Amino acid sequence: VASTELQLAQGTRTVLSDTEVDSTAAAGLVTLKRGTDHMKINNPLVKESSFIFITPKTKTNQNLFLLDQKEAEDEEKGSFTVGVDGKANDDIKFNYLIVN
């Protein structure tokens, strides 16, 4: 890919709850809230074959990992879920990047 200005984060983002967000962007910043153990990101770009990269922006001793990944089916949106080992001790901000 050659680009002088690749804008992957263009799109909309709507917070639905402490553990769920709707997004249409290929990249974004999400906060996993203190006291929770996962964050679901609904996104129409997610496919079974997508590579999803997660990068913490907050210093943490807890591990973030891809817990689940689902392609859109019928009326259901595609989604992926990021988990953390145990309940988050503090808010954990992380970037995501969806590559198809």
Regions of interest found by a model, annotated:
Residues 1-100:
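Extracellular receptor-binding modules and their adjoining Ser/Thr/Gly/Asp/Asn-rich linkers
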